[in-house]
Amino acid sequence: MRFTFAEAMTDPNFYAPLAQAAEKAGYAGFTIPDSLAYPEESDAAYPYTPDGNREFLDGKAFIETFIEAAALGAVTSTIRFTPFVLKLPVRPPALVAKQASSVAYLTNNRLALGVGTSPWPEDYEFMGVDFARRGKRMDECMDIFRGLTSGEYFEFHGEFYDIPRIKMTPAPTEPIPLLV
C-alpha cells in the first residue's frame, strides 16, 4: 500500500525538510497546496467550514505550485509531488502543460496533478476568466494538457482555446496523472 503525506498550509520553509522526512519514512507522495491570491472582500462562502468563513487563509504563504514542486524534487529522489488542488481553468492550459512537463522531466516523472475548478469567483475575476463557464473550460484545459504533454504534435480548436499544431519539449517520458 502507498501513502501520500498531505500538507496544506504550513510555513513554506518547512516543505523541503518535510518532503525529505516523508520520503525517508516511506511515503510515496507529497501534496502541495495551490492558491493564487486572497481577496480582501468576498461574497463566496468557503464550502469546507461550518460557517463558510475562510479567514484562516488570510496571510498564508502559498509558493507557486510548480516552483515548489521543482524545488522539492531537487532535494528528494523518489517521492511524487501532487498539487492538490491546482485551479486549472483559471490558468492558460498551454502554460500549465509546459510547467508540468518541465517539472516531470526534471524530477524523473515524479509529478501528478490534482486539478479542480476553484469555488472562488475572485480567482477567475482577477485572472480575466469567466467563472460561469468554468466546467466546460476545465474540460478543454484537460484535453489540451494531455495533448501537449504527449511529446507529439498536437492542435486544438475549442470554444475557449485555439491552439495551432505544436509540440512541446521536453515531454515527460510517462503520462502525467490527472486526478480530478
Walk through the language-model features, giving the residues of each.
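N-terminal beta1-alpha1-beta2 module of alpha/beta enzyme domains
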Residues: 1-75, 171-176
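Internal, glycine-rich beta/alpha segment that forms the wall or movable "lid"
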Residues: 40-41, 51-54, 70, 79, ...
